[in-house]
Amino acid sequence: MRVVFMGTPDIAATCLNKIIEKGYEIVGVYTQPDRPKNRGMKLAFSPVKEVAIAHDLPVFQPENFREEETVEQLRQLKPDVVAVVAYGRILPQKVLDIPEKGCINIHASLLPAYRGSAPYQWAVLDGLKETGVTAMYLCREMDAGDMIDTAKTPIGENETAGELLDRLAVLGAELLDKTLQGIEDGTVQSVPQDHSKATYAPMLDKTMCPIDFTKTAQQVHNHVRGMNPWPVATMELAGKRFKVYETALLSQSSTAAPGTVLGLSKQGLQLACGEGVIEIRVLQAEGGKRMAAPDYFRGHPLEL
């Protein structure tokens, strides 16, 4: 079975590694064009391109599939199936129609919940206890195709979005392998999504960073976890702006105004929330290094 793989970030690279390891006939790898990265702004390969090159797989990096020449190039690869994982491009119908066995996708949520570009981040932001990955057929509408299979996993109470993604990548790779096996031997089945239950997970942006201490301590904790590793939660304190990477829920309560500093323990800085108390464990002052909160405030004492 001839497979074309399409993907770009780390989760996709994990999936590509898996199907290489399993010995599928991969006739082409599509990934986004090289982009400038870091302060030097040198062009950098995507994680998927790195994997493809390491295994001598042909790499294609079109900006889009608007040109007929680009579509024909894919057609000439004669794929039986196209496997898509976080490619970052919407595929037009003329591309979806090319592989005889369809275009499949691994999506990092339990569809129809959290359609969109930031599903695992929103699962953490919303305080979900469980999420997973879904294998589905691609259609013209975003993340709305028929579902083939799912795999579930609990979300740890202190787990960040980045940590969750690392686990979902492994889960997704296993599900992709299982799905391709089912397609190859003709046993795969699918069911339509219940579109009435669809929810959406739009891309995060830096306007969402500031912590709202009028919310409950649990909501603040979820916010910090969901925004880690990007774009990272922030707070203002004593005229300075801090990035906040790690927090802990405390069992105590407080009648102080939300955002009030209650004290500094050996573990972190304690602040009042709309309900409950949150402890800031790891932070980074603007222009400074990421460090444990007690270490920072020993060198920069607060007036409590």
Residue map of PLM features:
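N-terminal Rossmann-like dinucleotide-binding module
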Residues: 1-42
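A residue-level signal for conserved active-site and pocket-lining positions in enzyme catalytic cores
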Residues: 7, 29, 52, 82, ...
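Short beta->alpha connector loops
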Residues: 8-11, 63-66, 87-90
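Donor/substrate-binding cores of folate-linked one-carbon enzymes
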Residues: 21-22, 32, 81-200, 207
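Conserved beta-strand segments of alpha/beta enzyme cores
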Residues: 25, 56-58, 102
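N-terminal glycine-/serine-/threonine-rich beta1-alpha1-beta2 phosphate-ribose binding loop
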Residues: 36-78
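Acyl-group handling in specialized metabolite and lipid biosynthesis
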Residues: 202-215
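An anion-binding loop in the catalytic cleft
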Residues: 213-304
